[in-house]
Design a protein with these regions (language model features):
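Acetyl-CoA-dependent GNAT
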Residues: 2-13, 21-25, 32-102, 107-108, ...
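Helix-turn-helix-type domain boundary/helix-start signal
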Residues: 20-21, 113
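Conserved active-site tyrosine of GNAT-family acetyltransferases
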Residues: 68, 149, 154
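A short, internal acetyl-CoA/4′-phosphopantetheine-binding micro-motif in the GNAT/acyltransferase core
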Residues: 104-112, 138-139
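Conserved acetyl-CoA-binding loop-helix of GNAT-fold acetyltransferases
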Residues: 112-125, 147-151
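Conserved GNAT acetyl-CoA-binding A-motif
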Residues: 128-139
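Conserved HGGG/HGGXW glycine-rich cap/lid loop of the alpha/beta-hydrolase fold
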Residues: 142
């Protein structure tokens, strides 16, 4: 199970990835992670200065967190550490039927190092062992992310508000025997 209990996940390159619960002291780092996900978009906004862009990212991060808190009570909000340094965030909700990867975001310097694959792989292992589906939403224009999840066995099953709804499901008995 993907938890922030001190478990160490290893990237394919052998780098140590750990999680810890996010707390108030992480706010600015988490806003920085959020801002990194909007950097290309905000680079096109020439009428705001850097302080205005940061204020926008704070307000958007706060709104996103409030939305997830309301829709997924009990969700886990963790800071991703790569060899002990803040590298990103992962938010996961669980219920009786599914595991939902609400959000995963990595700072640019932590991307393409196997961190996301290690963490999503741990969620897939949890889904497999619990017999639950694992769901995630990917922005329709983010082809790289969609392809990443498809390589891990996710399939698009719908669209909602500009996002692909993606799902990884444990193999059913019928699929396992080729029926």
């Amino acid at each position: 199970m993907l938890t922030s209990d001190g478990a160490v996940f290893e990237t394919a390159g052998g780098r140590a990835v750990t999680l810890r619960p996010a707390n108030e002291d992480d706010y600015e780092d988490l806003v920085r992670v959020y801002a990194s996900t909007r950097a290309a978009e905000l680079a096109q906004v020439t009428w705001w200065d850097d302080a205005q862009k940061l204020d926008f990212c704070r307000s958007q991060y706060d709104a996103q967190k409030l939305e997830y808190d309301a829709r997924y009570p009990g969700a886990e909000y963790d800071v991703i550490l790569l060899e002990g340094r803040t590298a990103g965030r992962i938010w996961v909700g669980r219920d009786e039927e599914e595991i939902r990867l609400l959000d995963i975001a990595l700072l640019p310097e932590a991307q393409r190092q196997g961190v996301g694959a290690a963490l999503v792989g741990a969620l897939i292992d949890e889904a497999r062992s619990s017999g639950k589906r694992l769901r995630h939403m990917v922005f329709i224009l983010n082809e790289g992310a969609r392809l990443f999840y498809e390589r891990l066995g996710f399939r698009v099953f719908g669209e909602f508000s500009g996002y692909f709804q993606m799902e990884w499901k444990p193999e059913s008995d019928d699929e396992a025997v080729g029926c």
